[in-house]
Amino acid sequence: MGDLPGLVRLSIALRIQPNDGPVFYKVDGQRFGQNRTIKLLTGSSYKVEVKIKPSTLQVENISIGGVLVPLELKSKEPDGDRVVYTGTYDTEGVTPTKSGERQPIQITMPFTDIGTFETVWQVKFYNYHKRDHCQWGSPFSVIEYECKPNETRSLMWVNKESFL
């Protein structure tokens, strides 16, 4: 086991396929558990891109709402301070969220040697045939996290979450 990094910075990007289209969110205020809702389309594929700093960290998969997404090492950035992984998240078979409701979905990413990153996204899954609803709101390119691994190397505390 190597040294425990003081801070881990990671970003998760989602792009709807096949055209690498943007994913949207809307600000719901305090009506639900979280103030932001990510809008996803059922029956669709999303490219997942995870960037991690420091570049010595390794992951093999990310679980999005219980769906295991294998991650493949894509590259280390030229300056060598971040590593990039990609995978595909498929919403085939996911039930659309009822009108006026939101779904909390668990996000977990186990890191080799330093513990598991965990967070919850508030999501609304839209029926594939109502895809125009999925494009209202604000597009985001990435969700960035600043995390601190705990001393037992079991999990990471999320200090900050930013939609960019």
Swiss-Prot record:
GO terms for molecular function: type 1 cannabinoid receptor binding. It comes from the Eukaryota. GO terms for biological process: negative regulation of signaling receptor activity; regulation of signaling receptor activity; regulation of trans-synaptic signaling by endocannabinoid, modulating synaptic transmission. One of its GO terms (cellular component) is plasma membrane. Interacts with the cannabinoid receptor CNR1 (via C-terminus). Does not interact with cannabinoid receptor CNR2. Belongs to the CNRIP family. This is CB1 cannabinoid receptor-interacting protein 1. It comes from Homo sapiens (Human).
